[in-house]
Amino acid sequence: MELSTCFAYGSLMWPDIMTRVCGREVSALQHTQAWLHGHARHPVRGQDYPGLVPQSGAQALQGVLYTGLTPQDFQRLDAFEGQEYERVPVEVVLEHPATTDGLAPAGAAPAARQKTWVYRYRPEFEYRLEPGDWSPQAFEAQGKARFCARYVGFTQTPAP
């Protein structure tokens, strides 16, 4: 599937982290708020980042949709996410300016939808997921500095 978009729901929601991972300034990339339905975001045991798993009836997850990613960006993202994650296509709901969950208010035109890639936690690693929801606010307040210190050296470009 030829997509140049990626929905970030964890550490990659922060453009400075996405810049480090992609190895180039991503401020030129268009990024907007988006929501993913039918999935849950759980903390990974012993880590500051989350794992995403399908879950029917789950509350919509807010994240960031990056547009304009290159094949080289995806090579680096694939290497960064590693064996615990698989890149899969999903559909996200783009931000509707009148709401906080991306859905259109009654009587308004429906919010736009977009097909995109997301990195989902592989089923064989789900035993590492903790119960509860991963908190972006807690990550920013407590985990981001630790995460950046741990992964600041990520500069490898995988072989083609």
How does the language model describe each region?
Residues 1-160:
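Glycine-aromatic micro-motifs
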